[in-house]
Amino acid sequence: MTYQDYILRQIQQAGQAWARIVRLIKDRQFETARMVLDQAYRQLIGLTSGAVLERDTNGLIARLRFDEAPAAGRDKCLALATLLRASGDTAAAQGDSVTAADTYHKALLVLLDTVLRDPSLALPDYAPTVESLDAELWAHALPVTTRQELLLYYEQAGFYAKAEDMLWAMLQAAPGDCAIVGAGRALYARLQHLSDAALIAGNLPRDEVDGGLADLDAYAGEHGC
């Protein structure tokens, strides 16, 4: 077996583990689900599930990408995001909303890092999407840094209304932050250079872009930015 075949096998195993865990959750076999997850984490990253959940996300990404070709590192990170989503699903099914949210957030960070590095990436069927993880976390206060990455992702993906929503969510979380105001002005400047058709496709027509920028300028004046 070549090294590339080994990597592909690891990725396939992560997808198979997720599919099995979905069935186990449906059957409420949570202990077995945790055992399957623990084995899958060990195979992928050499850590127990508990250790993965305790580690810093950037450290996990660095561990998976170290000394790997970009494609191999990317695929291993997608596998990790898939397993983290499964851990979150398991915790949610058991009513542990705190652990579920923490785990979904970690999965989201891993996935955002992956897709922002490779904008043209087509996700495998088993992998979570940014949108699905964002939806799981809608009731939770995300860090501004996470919202910044979500803004970049939604703009990159052409979901301009969602990018604008992230901007105002960031300002709500950090009122008067002039750096965020500056990032918002840069966002609107980029949007103004797009065609009317592109803006409409992104659910943010030009008049709403202009209105949003006017609102941001007013906000900036109120907060001394």
Model-found features: residue ranges?
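Alpha-helical adaptor scaffolds
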Residues: L109-F159, Q172
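Alpha-solenoid helical repeat scaffolds
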Residues: V52, P119, D125-Y126, V181-A183
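Generic helix N-cap/helix-start motif at coil->alpha-helix transitions
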Residues: Q10-Q13, L80, H140-R147, I180
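N-terminal alpha-helical interaction modules that lie
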Residues: M1-S97, A101-S120, A157-A174, L194-C225
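Short alpha-helical linear motifs
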Residues: T57-A62, D125-T129, Y188-L191
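Long amphipathic alpha-helical scaffold regions
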Residues: D177-S195
